[in-house]
Amino acid sequence: MEQNIYFDNGSTSWPKAPGVAASMTKLLESGAFNINRGNYEGAYELENQVLKTRMQLARFFHAPDSRCVVFTPGITYSLNCLLKGFLKPGDHVLVSSLEHNAVMRPLCQLASQDIHYTMIPAETDGTTHPESLEALIRPETKAVIMLHASNVCGTILPIREIGEICRRRHLFFAVDTAQSAGSVDIDMQKCNIDFLAFTGHKGLLGPQGVGGRVGKKGQRGPRAVPPQGIGGFLISEALDQELTPLIAGGTGSQSDSLLMPDYLPDKYESGTLNLPGIIGLHAALTYLDETGISAIHQKKMALTGHFLEKIREIPQAHVVGRQTLQDRLAVVSLDFPDYDNVEIAFALEQDYGIMTRVGLHCAPMAHQTLHTMPQGTIRFAFSHFNTVEEIDQCIAGFRELFSV
């Protein structure tokens, strides 16, 4: 077997950014204190590091205020907070036909509460047309909720155009940036994003177990905004007064009151935060700032272009989604119509050390849209730490498997 090659960065990035492991180890070994509780220097220093991470994230997503960054265990948690803390009986939302189960399963749970959704249809390459959205808006429609880029085929959705429609139609706009954060610049103000959910362990190159959301301040949106997040939400003062956190508990602030604090971020951060994860994310964001997202994206897309060019030499392979680099990320799904995708993925790992993800990728609606149900696809998601040589080894493995 060849040396292991990791092409599963769509699930989680590896390796992590330099400095992530060291920063977390240092915290755990030299003073893993708690913030907003301890009245001693070590706790104050750690609180300052958490504040710096909030400021990094606010700059990263072009949010105007770091107080709107709220930490959660992950992006699935954040999206559940949005859906279950905002929507009320009789409400209706629009979602793309490429959504992850982090959105679809909560919505299906909410159907018993008379909360409904309509899918905005995408083409078979993942292309979504903003103009198709307006015809689906109903009087009871409260929000548009969609991923920024498909975790199956990598197609980027036109969130700026859709955000403008939401602004004009006074709809709440929520964006899942699980695949795009850290790969492309995301400006929540220019895109009119009211709620931006993100994860720290994929394109942001941080540790697992941290994620969050960003909501926009001063925009018309939900009657209630859900709690928790790494990332956060920004919202007008009037709207903020209507919020009721789903999670309540100790915050280390206003402890004389049995009610939750009414100010950000404390209002939505009950309990002990994942401080090692936040410190690791701080190190990852520092690396991204120093390296530059543009440079990272350019390297990843160069690798993707090389893969798309070389895979054409394997006639058994069908590229699912866009065939070029336009409007896509460094995520490529392959289908082998005459073969078992699971067996091919297994052979790649066992015989050539190539690690991918095979199956439905927790996005069955996307596979229905892309016509890859029920077999799913083999997904290749590249990092800027990957190399052209690794891709060439992968193509050589395919040639050997199919005797091309």
Summary of predicted features, one role per range:
Residues 1-404:
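Pyridoxal 5′-phosphate
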